[in-house]
């Protein structure tokens, strides 16, 4: 900077709250203060991060986690010179920019073109100057002549390029090979060359290769159109205009205003989904249970290099399911299970799912319990068809028409699939798959072409040995698959129809027999494998059976020749091999969910409908951190489940730690950022193929098969991988007339009885509530919440409460009485315990109604000996502590975005207990400042397994990070346990 400080317009930086990383030039600080900028000592409060060092960890977390703009000090200087705040996009110090580390000398270009090139280079992280000296890395010159050119030729450290190199790098968003843009490669037409010789001298600046240190001063992008200097490759004015137009368009789409980009890197997976789920529920209905996040394994090691990543198949957690309530009732293995008590069901929900993957077999919520009552009592109406929480799915928007660019790989992919499907034993394809084995059920083995660490070799060898034994059994036992029908020639020039397969058709029931919708499982006899071993509560298996029987099916306790279907998770088991030998239909609980929604026995048609090709606990994607874009509702949930089954971590946000982005379309902010950060972008088939045994796909993220987007059904399985699994579906399931005549299903409700079906809303409808007979003063009016009851029971309680003059509390903060029959880990219970005066049983309300006044609560306080033993606490003591002082008073919490239960739920629980939740991640410096200064509030870090990559710096510096139980169990027991729930 020059010694003279430029005049700063008054209040120019008034809206800027800056956080300085590293040492800044004192004059930059002076300019900021003169413009009324405010320095903050905590980066979460900043609007701008100012730093020269783009590799500083604080800069990385500001961009990746908080999505804050990070600028170089030159942004301040040039903003002052221009008299206005410049866009932050062109001032990033980070090394991910196209021209980072480049200092270019511009020579022999017109002033207009020089301004344009200067702007392009500096905007994308480079530097420009007019003098050729030791600082220069590139010489930008349109012709192979001049003193600077001759000097640069003698220096191997200086690369010589034409201006086209700058334009092409920007248009393709990557640094191009300079050797292809050397000016001597240009071929000139003679006439134009002569014109150029006449004009060139006037446009060329002095060609002095001196070693002076003058750096050309930076300037903001010029708004003028660049005028040509005469050289053909760069000179046409239309070309310059076009390039600049594309540049501005690309930049605006890349780094549009902060408010648009703010949702990219810090997108809590849970918060919007919870809101969306509530929108799909009937008015007033709440999600049944909190999915209290589960496994808390040790902090994983660093991400392995690409050649090793994904090939480790580590035994570990059992395979589990998706986030929103999705199938029947939760099962869980015992892997340091986080303790959990359910709310309005006697069935205990055990949560050992990862934070972003809720239970595929979730505890039955009120609608499904209604189904059980219908099954048991027959007077209610037909059994509900949905085991999965009965969330009404909003129609998914149809994908936009694909441009020709994307149609071509899609057509090629379909042609390849059609051609391969026509051959009983397809020849080795030239792309993703290794040569198919002779036996149609065999799956490709994980490749061993690259050296593996000893632990990975051992685990991989163990998996291969299991698969080999499994495949040998299949070779001995499996019948020859039915002959395949000839198909159209593979040389067809048009893609086949979506459902055109060279296979015999697939059937559910015999098409000639009409099956009643209520009994769509007639003739199906299920045996269940894999799942029972993972169910901590054996009552859940009985629930499955009741639901299957309610739709005409049957469940046998053991596998027998009578069985038609095997419900299983993995293809690697003796029971699965026996079922395949006997040509039984082998499907998953996810398929059962699908047919329950459709009320029709349809063949499996998604990758999740088939058992996985590795043993339970096998994790082919254990080193992957996956994010998705373009998928909504059920499709997004399916991808979460697929990621979990494959052993990958799932994040709802995208940051540089992600290893794969699964896209529906090659569009959107996440996609653009993934390309910028060189994160592979694949379609959903990539993950489906891995689940079904094509482990070679782990190293094929760049193959055309997995980068063809806009597929009609991205979740459809690859035909070659499921040929044998679909074999049993080529024969229709026959249902005898005796079975059709003899079946008795729950009767349909009569038309006049429909209105009497109990409402699902926990709040009584306004018209059902009588006006209060007593009017109490606000101080004497109880504000009540109910938790753990059936909706119809809650409605009756609310009527009595209103008659007595009480009110239903709008929120836990305004609640004075919580009515519950037992201790439950619901949102209401865990928020109310910190603020209510009394937690009482329903008998208190009954006694009040009997006496027609509110009676003393002491004789009706809730006592739950079982829960108090389980959690080693006293509810009475917890309430006493909460009344004495809020548990989290004077404490700040930072909770990572992928936490489970959702961020909004955790925030409500923390705030009711007196704490505050920070919206942005605190820096190490800020944490140490709060830790060492006792007058500052303590900052507690809460995370989950899927977000541990966001906490690497904390672990490296020995800072404790806790799981959600620090909060959940903490508020229940009203204690702070800093040891039991921290990640090691």
UniProtKB/Swiss-Prot annotation:
The keyword DNA repair applies. Residues 94-183 are annotated as: Interaction with PAGR1. Residues 8-93, 94-183, 516-609, 616-704, 781-862, 883-924 form the BRCT domain. InterPro entries: BRCT_dom, BRCT_dom_sf, DDR_Transcriptional_Reg. It comes from the Eukaryota. Gene3D superfamilies: BRCT domain (3.40.50.10190). A motif (Nuclear localization signal) lies at residues 583-600. Signal peptide: none annotated. The BRCT 1 and 2 domains mediate the interaction with PAGR1A. This is PAX-interacting protein 1. It comes from Bos taurus.
């Amino acid at each position: 900077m020059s010694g003279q400080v430029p005049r700063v317009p008054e209040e120019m930086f008034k809206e800027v709250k800056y956080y300085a990383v590293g040492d800044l030039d004192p004059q930059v600080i002076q300019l900021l203060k003169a413009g009324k900028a405010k320095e903050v000592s905590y980066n979460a409060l900043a609007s701008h991060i100012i730093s020269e060092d783009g590799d500083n960890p604080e800069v990385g977390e500001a961009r990746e986690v908080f999505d804050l703009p990070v600028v170089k000090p030159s942004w301040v200087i040039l903003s002052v010179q221009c008299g206005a705040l410049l866009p932050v996009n062109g001032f990033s110090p980070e090394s991910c920019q196209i021209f980072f580390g480049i200092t270019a000398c511009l020579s022999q270009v017109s002033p207009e073109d020089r301004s344009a090139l200067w702007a392009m280079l500096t905007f994308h992280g480079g530097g420009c100057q007019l003098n050729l000296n030791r600082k220069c890395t590139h010489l930008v010159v349109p012709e192979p002549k001049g003193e600077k050119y001759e000097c640069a030729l003698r220096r191997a450290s200086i690369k010589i390029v034409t201006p086209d190199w700058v334009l092409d790098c920007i248009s393709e968003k990557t640094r191009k090979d300079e050797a292809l843009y050397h000016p001597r490669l240009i071929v000139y037409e003679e006439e134009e060359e002569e014109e150029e010789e006449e004009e060139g001298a006037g446009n060329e600046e002095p060609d002095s290769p001196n070693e002076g240190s003058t750096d050309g001063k930076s300037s903001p992008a010029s708004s003028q159109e660049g005028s040509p200097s005469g050289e053909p490759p760069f000179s046409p004015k239309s070309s310059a205009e076009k390039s600049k137009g594309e540049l501005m368009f690309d930049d605006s789409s890349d780094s549009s205003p902060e408010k648009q980009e703010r949702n990219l890197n810090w997108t809590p997976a849970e918060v919007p989904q919870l809101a969306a789920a509530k929108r799909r529920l009937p008015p007033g209905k709440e999600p049944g249970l909190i999915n209290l996040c589960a496994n808390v394994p040790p902090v994983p090691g660093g991400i392995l290099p690409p050649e090793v990543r994904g090939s480790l198949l580590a035994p570990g957690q059992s395979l589990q399911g998706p986030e929103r309530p999705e199938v029947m009732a939760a099962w869980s293995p015992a892997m340091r299970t986080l303790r959990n008590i359910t709310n309005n069901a006697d069935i205990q929900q055990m949560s050992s799912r990862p934070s972003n993957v809720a239970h595929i077999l979730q505890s039955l919520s009120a609608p499904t319990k209604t189904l059980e009552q219908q099954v048991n009592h027959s007077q209610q109406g037909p059994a509900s068809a949905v085991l999965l929480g009965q969330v009404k799915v909003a129609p998914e928007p149809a994908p936009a028409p694909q441009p020709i660019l994307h149609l071509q790989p899609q057509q090629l992919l379909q042609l390849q699939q059609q051609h391969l499907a026509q051959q009983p034993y397809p020849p080795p394809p030239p792309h993703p798959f290794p040569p198919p084995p002779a036996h149609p059920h065999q799956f490709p083995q994980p490749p061993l072409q690259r050296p593996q660490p000893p632990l990975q070799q051992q685990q991989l060898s163990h998996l291969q040995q299991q698969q080999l034994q499994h495949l040998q059994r299949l070779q001995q036992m499996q019948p020859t698959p039915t002959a395949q029908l000839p198909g159209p020639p593979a040389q067809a020039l048009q893609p086949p129809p979506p459902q055109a397969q060279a296979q015999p058709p697939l059937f559910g029931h015999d098409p000639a027999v009409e099956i009643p919708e209520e009994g769509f499982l007639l003739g199906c006899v299920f045996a269940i494998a894999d799942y029972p071993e993972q169910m901590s509560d054996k009552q859940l298996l009985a629930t499955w059976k009741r639901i299957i029987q309610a739709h005409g099916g049957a469940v046998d306790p053991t596998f027998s020749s009578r069985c038609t279907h095997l419900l299983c998770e993995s293809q690697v088991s003796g029971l699965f091999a026996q079922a395949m030998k006997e040509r039984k239909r082998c499907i998953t609980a996810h398929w059962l969910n699908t047919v329950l929604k459709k009320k029709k026995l349809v063949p499996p048609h998604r990758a999740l409908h088939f058992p996985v090709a590795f043993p339970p606990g096998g994790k082919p994607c254990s080193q992957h951190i996956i994010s998705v874009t373009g998928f909504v509702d059920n499709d997004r949930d399916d991808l979460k489940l697929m990621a979990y089954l494959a052993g990958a971590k799932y994040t709802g946000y995208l940051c540089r730690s992600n290893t794969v982005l699964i896209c529906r379309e090659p569009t959107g902010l996440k996609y653009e950022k993934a390309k910028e950060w060189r994160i592979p972008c694949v379609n959903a088939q990539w993950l489906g193929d891995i689940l079904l045994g094509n482990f070679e796909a782990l190293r094929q993220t760049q193959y055309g098969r997995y980068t063809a987007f806009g597929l009609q059904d991205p979740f459809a399985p690859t035909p070659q991988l499921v040929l044998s699994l679909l074999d049993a579906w080529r024969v229709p399931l026959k249902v005898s007339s005796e079975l059709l005549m003899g079946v008795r299903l729950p009767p349909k409700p009569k038309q006049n009885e429909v209105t009497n079906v109990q409402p699902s809303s926990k709040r009584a409808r306004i018209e059902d509530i009588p006006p209060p007979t007593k009017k109490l003063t606000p101080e004497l009016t109880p504000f009540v919440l109910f938790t753990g009851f059936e909706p119809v029971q809650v409605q009756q309680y609310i009527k009595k409460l209103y008659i007595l003059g009480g009110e239903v509390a709008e929120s836990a903060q305004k609640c004075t009485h919580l009515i519950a029959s037992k201790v439950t880990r619901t949102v209401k219970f865990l928020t109310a315990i910190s603020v209510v005066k009394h937690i009482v049983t329903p008998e208190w309300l009954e006694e009040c109604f009997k006496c027609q006044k509110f009676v003393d609560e002491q004789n009706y306080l809730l006592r739950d000996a079982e829960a108090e033993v389980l959690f080693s606490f006293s509810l009475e003591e917890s309430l006493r502590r909460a009344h004495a002082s809020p548990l989290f008073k004077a404490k700040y919490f930072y909770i990572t975005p992928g936490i489970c239960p959702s961020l909004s739920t955790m925030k409500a629980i923390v705030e009711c207990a007196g704490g505050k939740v920070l919206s942005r991640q605190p820096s190490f410096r800020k944490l140490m400042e709060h830790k060492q200064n006792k007058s500052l509030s303590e900052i507690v870090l809460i995370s989950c397994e899927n977000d541990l990559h966001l906490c690497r710096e904390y672990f490296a510096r020995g800072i404790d990070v806790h799981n959600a139980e620090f909060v959940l169990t903490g508020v229940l027991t009203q204690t702070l346990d800093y040891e039991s729930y921290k990640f090691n």
